[in-house]
Amino acid sequence: MTYFLNDIRPPSPNDITPSFTLLTKELFDKLDGVRKESLGDFRTVTEKKAFIIKTFINTFRTHIGNDIYPSAKLIFPEKSGRIYFIKEVALARLLIKMYKIPKESEDYITLHDWNKSYQRSRRFSIDEKKIRDLPLQASRIISKRRPIVDKLEEYTVPQINSSLDQLALEKVSQGQIDILKPLFDNLSIPEVRWLIHILLNKSILTSMERFFFNTWHPDGYRVFSICNDLQKTLQFSTNPDLRLDPSQLAIHPCFKFKPQLSERLTTSYKTLVKKLQRKHEMDPPYEKKFQELGLENKFYIEEKMDGDRMLLHKDGDSFKFFSRRLKDYSYLYGESFQFGALTKFLAHAFAGNIQSVILDGEMVAYDYERNVILPFGTLKSSAIQESVRQFTTIDQYEQQTAYPFFLVFDILFLNGKDLTNYPLFFRKNILNRILRPIPNRFEVLDTRLGSSSEDIERAIREVVSSRCEGLVLKNVQSKYEIDGFRNPDWIKVKPEYLEKFGENLDLVVIGKSPAIKNSYMCGLKSVTDGVYYSFCTCANGIEIEEFDKIERLTHGKWIKTDVSMPPESLIKFGTKIPTFWIHPSDSLVLEIRARSIDTRAGTSYAVGSTLHNNHCRKIREDKSIDECVTLQEYTHIKANYINDLNKAQTALGKKREPVYSLDNESKLKKVKVESDLFSGIEFLIMSDKREADGEVTTIEEMKAMVKQYGGKIVNSVDLATNYQIMVITERELPVSSQYLSKGIDLVKPIWIYECIKRGCVLQLEPYFIFASKNWDNFNHMVDQYGDSYIIHHPLNIVVPKLSESELEDLRNGFDWGDLKPWIYLFKGLSFYVCGNNLSARFLKERIERFSGDLSKHFIECCYIVIPDNHSRPLMLREIDKMSNQISREMVIDKNGGSSRIPHFVTEAFVQASIKMNYIPDPDDYKFR
């Protein structure tokens, strides 16, 4: 069948052949030169860039012609389809060889050690942005070392493209030099810089790409989104006033597009159910089908698979497989019924009248011996070995017990008809009618109907019991939107794990503080006022290559905060100010994972809290700043987190003994008085005492201690008493203000311990005071630095102005630098190690060596670790028992929140944590 995208013809040749100079001077240089300080009559950076692009396109149409595709291959290098196999380090080494740069020279060191410690230690000694920009640095070195010529040669766009096409075929360094050296010797230095940028396949237009497409033709970006083909996008029409029909803008088989994505759960189950049950008006035929299927107040519940999101395209006997990130895996899974790891089994998988179809699903690796779906990382090797197996008679591949298994959950196109605008229940009905499942090779993903929060709870328990990834809940009427749209009618739900904080948050970079290792400040956008509020700072987990990528993508966009602060209508910082700030529209997205939320951040960040022990998982180039977590979403996440902290942190849901009870009073009466240290003092103890390591001394334990040393315990304050009154607390409570208004000081529990330790009643000093209206009376008891004359205090007490989080920042940045204290790597985390063989004992020792806690109860730990050396069948049976018990005893409240559960991880999780000196995502080390 012929489709619109198959029938696009190149426009007539241009009147004039465009030069490379035209692109660099009229587009690249001008866009790169846009600064907030030089906007002129334009209100924003984006507005000025839009004007530059419009002017360039008008100039091109008027003076050059309608065939912009050859030029677009240079304007959009990352979309040109050319791969040069030249990364930054390889390019730097190529330049050394090309210009015979001596080993001891400054230029040699700059290029040879581009990604090594030389750059990290030296990069801020001169203009930082220049030394981090390889194209700029390389062009500067080339300008000094290339032969001097009387007149530079002007290259045309076809000439540059021809050279780059040759380069894409050349794998030998000398051949690459022969192609590139004439260009480097004869282009102007600014052109050399942009050519290097193109060689590295880096985006030039960045956030203005969509605008460029739509300026060329109003349907431009939509066409690009349905095919991701630069040539077809820029050649489908020479008349921007001639719009395409909706049928032409529909998806086409064998043309790649980004699939629809799901949102994460941000509300209670009860609210979510109401949202998923929401009904929209439909045409009579669909309404009739809706009622026939009994879908009133129902929603779909599907298992979230641990695989590779994949779109299967079938057109006649031809197949295409495209991943979520548009990578073509057809060579692996098959392009025909004859060959391929999957397609060779699909000859009878479709109904006889199916000519063309697009299916959305998840590609997983299935182990037929163990009858389990394997972790995501095993998928590619399984597919490769399955593909090779069909071409060999050698039985070396017979040991491979896994192969690709495609689970389909949606149909988007059928026999020339785009189905994305049809309701999901209609699409699923079609899907079940046209497919003939091949067991454990090609099946429709099981879908069940739910109608209440109890249905979600049951499904979550099953997920926990089977150690699966989670659920996806879908509105039965939901439509499908391509291009990576996150549909609010598709919600992913995952079990909550026994980490203090297990969310991966996509955050916008808004600031930077240069150091040996850059740290990037991220912010949250408020949907109410559009302002970005500073939230956290991250440096861990970013590889040198990623640091370089961030610097490339944001080059020239940074503004020094000591020169110009951002307007408060755009960005709000707390007391922690980065060295540079960047406009969010010029920035990028980082995926950040943290161990906990630190609510003690105070005014350091504008949000009022921050992420503790965070690290960057990756740069999210596939996400725009508008797809990140908002301030309001984070507020909800934080509320759930704090609520979880207030609950028992185990799946057992044990009830704590009430603080005040008749039984407690009777126990207190039985305490024997052994000293008169506190005689004449009445104690009202209002809070527990919590140590930095998490150890808690309860109110009842302190009461017993006070009574043991002769103190009197009271439950309220009587101002007429003859006793001295001591109100003990280290928490702000609703009644605190009442006592302060009566002139009563609030004293920390540590005072009780210090008195007992020294055997005398100590005077009250600032160190012991939690809150008071009489601070002046205490300040004279310490020296000018706040240090007591009689009591030794640690540094964080001598400098009480610094919060714990600020002290932690100072320790990390000053005391340790890059040599972080590995000994505290697992501090605050508990592990249950399966087995008791030699391997398990060694593993336990390693965990304890890095300050991890070993738990005797698997339900109460953060991570259940399976050592490498074990009997797999025995271990699987044991783990299945654990999973079932965790599922049974998991507590789910009425709001859909649940007690947290442990991760099942392999020994590699512990080893990787120690190697990287931070806690990686346990999903990457899941045990199956």
Curated annotation (Swiss-Prot):
Q: Which UniProt keywords apply?
A: ATP-binding, DNA damage, DNA recombination, DNA repair, Ligase, Magnesium, Metal-binding, Nucleotide-binding, Nucleus, Repeat
Cofactor(s) this protein cannot do without: Mg(2+)
Question: Where in the cell is the protein located?
Answer: Nucleus
Which positions does UniProt annotate for ATP binding? E302, K304, R309, E362, F409, E469, K474, K492, K494
Protein residues bound to Mg(2+) 1: E362
Residues at the active site: K304 (n6-amp-lysine intermediate)
Keyword match Nucleotide-binding: yes
**Induction of this protein: by what?**
Cell cycle-regulated. Expression peaks in late G1 and during the morphological transition.
Q: Which residues cross the membrane?
A: none
Cystine bridges: none
Q: State the PROSITE patterns in the record.
A: BRCT, DNA_LIGASE_A1, DNA_LIGASE_A2, DNA_LIGASE_A3
Known role: DNA ligase involved in DNA non-homologous end joining (NHEJ); required for double-strand break (DSB) repair. Not required for the repair of DSBs induced by ionizing radiation or UV light. Has an important role in morphogenesis, positively affecting the capacity to form hyphae.
Q: Which family does it belong to?
A: Belongs to the ATP-dependent DNA ligase family.
What is the protein's name according to its record? DNA ligase 4
What organism does the UniProt record list as the source? Candida albicans (strain SC5314 / ATCC MYA-2876)
| Gene behind the chain | LIG4
